[in-house]
Amino acid sequence: MSRTVSKLVINNLDLYYGEFHALKDVNLDIEEKEITAFIGPSGCGKSTLLKSINRMNDLVKNCKITGDITLEGEDVYRQLDINQLRKKVGMVFQKPNPFPMSIYDNVAFGPRTHGIHSKAELDDIVERSLKQAALWDEVKDRLHKSALGMSGGQQQRLCIARALAIEPDVLLMDEPTSALDPISTAKIEELVIQLKKNYTIVIVTHNMQQAVRISDKTAFFLMGEVVEYNKTSQLFSLPQDERTENYITGRFG
């Protein structure tokens, strides 16, 4: 019988922006090679937690964090420097944000930053990453054209390829399909499910149907708290907290 392994452990995490208590005693075990969805109304702390995992909140003035986030047993705030962490944890944002450079250079950007400059090695990384992002066949003949000429859906898959190029352990996705049309959304969802074979994925989504379609576990956030965390099928079919039931049935949110 296979045993699940916690890749990320969030323990007694509190986060303040000045006097505002944005995350309240959050405790989550995020398991390896699973898709974990964060759902909840706007402003409930989903994206704040995502940004805490890869320390994007380091740049926010008056942000104070207590508690622990560990990645494979290492504290991301006390034991990993920011460059180590960013190599282990990739991030894909809500709006596609390709760099104003070629498709090739977008994907090669991270590996170059981490010291890889061999053309042969970069060629292999770019091809592998674009294939993983289901984009290679669409762009292999125009790798040196600007990424800004791609469609929105292609740009988002390019951003996924760029994140994968550094071979992270964890991929964080902050509403990656909210700016896309339904066809592009379906492609991204299919891609995310495929990526689960090799990566631990955490996705923030406002689309509850999306959480049902792609995630193994779901955490429901409300006013900075994790109200409920369970297997997705159980959380949506038999919620244990009345607030979860009210949210997923559309009574608020």
Swiss-Prot record:
Main location as per UniProt: membrane
Bilayer topology: Peripheral membrane protein
Do you know which SUPFAM superfamilies this protein is assigned to? P-loop containing nucleoside triphosphate hydrolases
Q: Which reaction(s) does the protein catalyse, per the Swiss-Prot or TrEMBL entry?
A: phosphate(out) + ATP + H2O = ADP + 2 phosphate(in) + H(+)
Q: Identify a single GO molecular function assigned to this protein.
A: ATP binding
Alphabetical list of PANTHER family matching this protein:
ABC TRANSPORTER I FAMILY MEMBER 17 (PTHR43423:SF1)
Fetch the NCBIfam families from UniProt: 3a0107s01c2
Q: Which family does it belong to?
A: Belongs to the ABC transporter superfamily. Phosphate importer (TC 3.A.1.7) family.
**Subunit arrangement?**
The complex is composed of two ATP-binding proteins (PstB), two transmembrane proteins (PstC and PstA) and a solute-binding protein (PstS).
| Protein name, per record | Phosphate import ATP-binding protein PstB 3
The record's gene field reads pstB3
